[in-house]
Amino acid sequence: MSSSGTSITCEVGLQLIVPDRAPVPLVARLDYSVDDPYAIRAAFHVGDDEPVEWIFARELLTVGIIRETGEGDVRIWPSQDGKERMVNIALSSPFGQARFHAQVAPLSEFLHRTYELVPAGQESDYIDIDAEIAEHLS
């Protein structure tokens, strides 16, 4: 895990769940920045292909570690693998679907660091609404 005063990056090992086959191990890079304090960017690396990138709410991952949450494109829910706490992440788009299985511990550590950077409920303090509106109107 690496961090600066304005961002945090973490690589997490996941398993891609493939029907009728053994899970495929892969790495996802998670990025969080005060420039977009509500979002987590995830880049899923499969083999030598370009990473597949998704953006979803930090709160979605936070809640999904504890209980099932999300609808539509991103769903996250906890599970147990023996004594190991796990989390499932299901992604859906017009181009396909994917389901991943990951250990909770590294995701929790990543989230903890994001909340140290931008505490819950203070995300709007990091957004310049006037600048955002001006950018969209120009």
UniProtKB/Swiss-Prot annotation:
Record-level GO BP terms: division septum assembly; positive regulation of FtsZ-dependent cytokinesis; sporulation resulting in formation of a cellular spore
Record Gene3D superfamilies: Sporulation-specific cell division protein SsgB
The keyword DNA damage is annotated on this UniProt entry: no
Compartmental location: Cell septum
Major subcellular site: other
InterPro entries listed in its UniProt record: SsgB, SsgB_sf
Keyword set includes Cell cycle: yes
Keyword list, A-Z: Cell cycle, Cell division, Septation, Sporulation
Annotated Gene Ontology cellular component terms: cell septum
Assembly: Monomer. Interacts with SsgA. Interacts with FtsZ (via N-terminus).
Family: Belongs to the SsgA family.
Role, per record: Involved in sporulation-specific cell division. Required for early stages of sporulation. Important in the process of growth cessation prior to sporulation-specific cell division. Recruits cell division protein FtsZ to the future septum sites and tethers the contractile ring structure (Z ring) to the cytoplasmic membrane during sporulation. Stimulates polymerization and filament length of FtsZ in vitro.
The protein's name in its UniProt record: Sporulation-specific cell division protein SsgB
Gene: ssgB
